UniProtKB/Swiss-Prot annotation:
Pfam families with a match to the protein in the record: Ndc80_HEC, NDC80_loop
Disordered: region residues: 28-47, 53-72, 98-128
InterPro entries for the chain: Kinetochore_Ndc80 (IPR005550), Ndc80_CH (IPR055260), Ndc80_sf (IPR038273)
Similarity annotation: Belongs to the NDC80/HEC1 family.
Subunit structure: Component of the NDC80 complex, which consists of ndc80, nuf2, spc24 and spc25.
A single MF term (Gene Ontology): microtubule binding
Main subcellular localisation: nucleus
A Gene Ontology biological process term: cell division
Swiss-Prot/TrEMBL keywords: Cell cycle, Cell division, Centromere, Chromosome, Coiled coil, Kinetochore, Mitosis, Nucleus
Superkingdom to which the source organism belongs: Eukaryota
One Gene Ontology cellular component annotation held by this UniProt entry: Ndc80 complex
Annotated protein name in UniProt: Probable kinetochore protein ndc80
Length: 736
């Protein structure tokens, strides 16, 4: 008696069953309201149980609404409000062989009455006033495409018909069709069947899919809705007239339909046997939990239906305890592999964490590695720049080497020409016959000219050294100018002045470049002997003997157009900077105001925090008082529970006495019913006798009136000399 009577109570919503199963409900679980729905209220938690003696038909079934996966047995599914609207028949054992005197009894078979008194979830009630959910199934309805689809199967092929017919016949034979339907099948049944054969085969196949369905109408009315619910692809090509005559040319179509039903039933059998569980697991769908819950629900509901009308909630809850324990054990067995996997993963995780810790301890300092990496990246970038510069110099030196080789070849050619000229001159001198005095005089003249040449070469060397210094200085200036131009272009890119499509360029080209001649001048171009001027100085010359003019060296007019444009841009930028500074000042003022508001709010929060602490202290005091009161209430409740247990024990004895009185009252009621029937028959006999007497009296009076009317007519004819007086002119007294 101390058990919680609310545990899995039948009369309260079962919130613990919500969202446990993804299995669709069978069509027999989608209950339709029977004809009793027109005379009474639906069985909900607010309505009490009704006895079979007061019902006009079999008890109304709970209306289980179709639900999607994940919410098959929620609080709204109708299971929580199921009420058993029948009473236990205490006279079933004593009077099992006679009909009940209850009004509205619809069956003389006690077994059928017992089945209809407590119907299972796997049965379907007859369609009545409330049968709005007729032909419901767990196959969802989907809109079909327009037109009649064409069946791609070769149903007109004799060999194909023989093959699927043999498969269907073997399936029927192996699954006890003849024993269940009490109908014999022959070898030619599926070649030239009768209408009865088709009806039995179709009903049996559909019962394999939905065992609780009951065929109540003709087949031409039952088959189309069933095919539509099963989503048979070619149900539009089957008409009611064809269903009424399945033989002849229509039989291949119906044979294909029966074969499709057989395949569907086989698929459901395989699903029930768990052949698709591995495929579901590979797809990431775990159906083991759904199977456990479905077995629990079916078993618990079946045991609950076995209870009597007077069974209380505690006993009903006790019926569910074994099923709950079994479900818990199955879940524990199913979760063992997951627990093992979790343990293995945890061990692997710990091992990996240990490895990470060891690697972190043995690894060098990441900051040093990052610093070293940045240094290497910087060195890499410098080496790449150096390689690019060296590559450019290599190309330039290759061009110079090629130029010098050409000059060397030309010089060798000139030397050879000079040697030839000297030999010619020597031979000419020999032919002329010059004397020794002439030779001395020419030598003296040569020495004088050589001395003059040496002085000239000295002055040339001095001039060349001064030229080299000037060339070096000019080269440094040129390189500095190139750096300045490069810096200018870089700043132009940064300030969106370069290229001409930039924002601040406004279509003008501000990119600066040097108009420097890259070619070298040879000695032949200069028109003299090989010059001692270095090749680096060739870039400083616009022409062989002319340098660059400052105005022509740069590609843009810096002091004119560029300077004015830059001043305009500078002015614009200063204005924008000024506006940005003003905006920044406004935002700083706004930020200061926000900080002041935050300080005020912070003070308010501190005040609220003080109030919260005071409220918490008040709450603690109230909690202590409430705890004390709760302890006193618990003691009072325990005392009342003990008194309630005593009252229940007393009530059990009273219930037994009331049951005995109910049995006596039922016996007296049946005796009174028999006496009332006998009295009714006696009264019917008396009423019939009285009616016969009244009828005879009426006939006698009518005959007397007719005789009197004839007598009056004769008397009137005699008095008036044979004239006929109309019956309408006879006075009322004479008529009577």
């Amino acid at each position: 008696m101390s058990q919680d009577t609310g545990l899995f109570s039948i009369k309260r919503p079962r919130e613990s069953l919500a969202h446990f199963s993804a299995l669709p409900q069978p069509s027999s679980a989608l209950k339709r309201t029977s004809s009793i729905g027109a005379f009474g209220n639906p069985p909900t938690a607010q309505h009490t149980r009704m006895s079979l003696l007061n019902s006009a038909s079999r008890p109304q079934q709970p209306n289980f609404q179709r639900s999607s996966s994940g919410g098959a047995f929620g609080a709204d599914a109708g299971l929580s409000s199921v009420r058993r609207s029948v009473s236990s028949n205490i006279f079933h054992g004593a009077s099992a062989g006679r009909q009940s005197y209850a009004p509205g009894s619809f069956s003389s078979n006690p077994a059928s009455q017992n089945l209809q008194r407590r119907s299972s979830v796997f049965s379907r009630p007859s369609a009545g006033v409330g049968g709005a959910m007729g032909h419901q199934s767990f196959f969802t309805q989907v809109p079909n495409a327009a037109g009649v689809p064409r069946d791609p199967r070769p149903l007109r092929d004799r060999s194909f018909q023989a093959r699927i017919g043999q498969e269907l016949l073997e399936y029927l034979t192996h699954n006890n069709f003849e024993l269940e339907m009490k109908h014999t099948l022959g070898q030619n049944t599926l070649r030239s069947p009768t209408q009865k054969d088709f009806n039995y085969i179709f009903q049996w196949l559909y019962h394999r899919i939905d065992p609780g369905y009951r065929f109540q109408k003709s087949m031409d009315a039952e088959v189309p809705p069933i095919l539509k619910q099963l989503r048979y692809p070619y149900e539009k090509g089957i008409t009611k007239s064809q269903i009424a005559a399945v033989g002849g040319q229509n039989w291949p179509t119906f044979l294909g339909m029966l074969h499709w039903l057989m395949q569907l039933a086989q698929m459901m059998d395989r699903f029930i046997m768990g052949e698709y569980d591995e495929a579901c697991a590979e797809a990431g769908v775990d159906v083991s939990g759904d199977r456990i819950i479905f077995r629990f629900l079916t078993g618990a509901y079946h045991d609950w239906l076995q209870g009597g009308e007077d069974e209380d909630d505690e006993t009903a809850g006790q019926r569910l305890v074994p099923h709950i324990e079994m479900m818990a054990q199955e879940f524990e067995r199913g979760n063992e592999k997951y627990v093992q996997e979790v343990q293995a993963l945890e061990a692997e995780n710990r091992a990996l964490r240990d490895q990470i810790e060891e690697m972190e301890k043995s690894a060098p300092d990441m900051a040093k590695l990052d610093k070293h990496f940045r240094i290497l990246e910087d060195d890499k970038r410098k080496f790449e720049d150096y390689n690019q510069n060296v590559q450019g110099k290599i190309e330039k030196y290759e061009n110079r080497i090629k130029f010098l080789e050409d000059e060397l070849q030309k010089t060798e050619a000139d030397l050879q020409a000079a040697e030839d000229e000297r030999a010619g001159l020597q031979s000419s001198v020999d032919r002329q016959g010059i004397t020794i005095q002439d030779i001395d005089r020419m030598n003296t003249e040569r020495d004088r000219l050589q001395k003059i040449l040496d002085d000239t070469m000295g002055r040339l060397e001095e001039t060349h050294s001064r030229v080299m210094e000037k060339e070096k200085e000019a080269s440094e200036k040129l390189e500095a100018l190139e750096e300045v131009v490069k810096a200018y272009n870089t700043l132009g890119y940064q300030t969106s002045l370069i290229p001409s499509s930039a924002v601040n360029a406004k279509g003008q080209d501000y990119e600066l470049s040097l108009n420097v001649n890259e070619s070298n001048f040879s000695a032949s171009q200069i028109g003299s002997a090989p010059s001692r001027i270095s090749p680096e100085g060739d870039r400083l010359l616009a022409e062989p003997f002319t340098g660059y003019h400052p105005a022509h060296l740069l590609s843009l007019d810096l002091r004119g157009t560029v300077r004015s444009s830059l001043q305009t841009l500078r002015k614009d930028i200063n204005e924008r900077r000024k506006r940005a500074a003003d905006d920044d000042l406004d935002r700083r003022n706004l930020l200061d105001n926000i900080k002041e508001a935050m300080d005020e709010k912070r003070s308010e929060v501190e005040a609220l925090e003080h109030r919260r602490r005071a409220a918490e202290e008040e709450f603690e005091r109230t909690k202590e008082i409430t705890t004390t009161q709760k302890l006193a209430s618990d003691a009072q409740i325990e005392k009342m529970e003990k008194e309630l247990a005593k009252m229940r024990a007393t009530m059990s004895e009273s219930v037994q006495l009331m049951e005995q009185r109910e049995m006596n009252t039922n016996i007296e009621y049946e005796q009174l019913t028999l006496r009332a029937n006998a009295l009714r028959e006696e009264l019917h006999t008396n009423v019939e006798s009285m009616l016969n007497d009244v009828i005879r009296f009426k006939v006698h009076v009518q005959k007397g009136l007719e005789d009197y009317e004839g007598f009056v007519v004769d008397e009137v004819e005699q008095e008036l000399g044979g004239d006929m007086v109309p019956a309408d002119d006879i006075p009322p007294e004479e008529e009577l």
